Amino acid sequence: LLTDRDVLDAQIPGRDLLIVTNTTVAKLYLARLTGSFAQRRIAECILPDGEQHKTLQTAGWVFDALVANKMNRDATVLALGGGVVGDIAGFAAASYQRGIGYVQMPTTLLAQVDSSVGGKTGVNHPGGKNLIGAFYQPRAVIADTDVLATLPDRELKSGLAEVIKHGCVWDPLLFNWLDRSIPQLLARDAEALTYAIGRSCEIKATVVARDEREHDLRAILNFGHTFGHAIEAATGYDKYLHGEAVGLGMLIAADLSHRLGLIDAAVKERLRDVMVRTGLPTEAPRIGAARAYELMQMDKKVVAGAVRLVLLEKLGRAIITDQYPKAALDATLAEHFK
């Protein structure tokens, strides 16, 4: 798709185009993509790679590029990269001149199955993840599975964590399929990856269509994220990939669900087994229970000081609640964060 002019011309409007990417992806795909456009005025903004660079300062470089190239409201921002690039580019597009067009071309599995769909954009703050941002829908998402051939194994596994999440909260058949298909997915079998991506996008699109602004239902897609975001923030956004932190968060949320009697031990252990066989971490960092809870209080689902959590009732069904004994949460945090 990177070189398919018919697709690019149909999905990416306007003459003026700012391609936002990072140093890693630029070396692999930027020249190939820019060579696929005819009669366009193209500018480039190449960002440093990594979650630790998902900041207002980095977003400022995108604004600088838009201004320097005299881009107006007819321009389009094209995000070529993973979740960090997509979030920053989308945030810049949402903010510049109060909103210009943008298109996502996700190059990681995590971005293709999750972050490129749904319109969440933003940057991190030292006080918490994604605290600064906007809901802003891309005009198109162009997911080329061929680019996953160059994705590092660790990034592939990180993306699979979000597929596992979709199975946990919405589709037990997807979870069962994942349970059987981990070897094929890790081997990058094209048919398996295409199904995982397609089904994940269907699930997320269904949920977002019912609750775009995350008033209630969409919050189930944050399963594992309240704990996971605390892990990312506590470790400076540079020790764990996003999917790795979310995977740890799902295990912690499943443990709490079990303590509350919502699921039995077999469900919790089955989820852990899938994580282990996927090659995802299963032991949370020892950041301390008090620090973890402090960071959780900055979560966007907090209402009137109450930390709302996404918990499992069974595989394929999640609830959002703040009605749980604080002692159960404290015991869970103490168990996992020491």
Question: Which residue ranges define each predicted feature?
Answer:
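A glycine/threonine-rich phosphate-anchoring loop and its flanking beta-alpha core
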Residues: 91-184
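C-terminal charged capping/lid subdomain of soluble metabolic enzymes
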Residues: 18, 161-163, 262-338
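Alpha-helix C-terminal capping segments
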Residues: 88-99, 234-235, 255
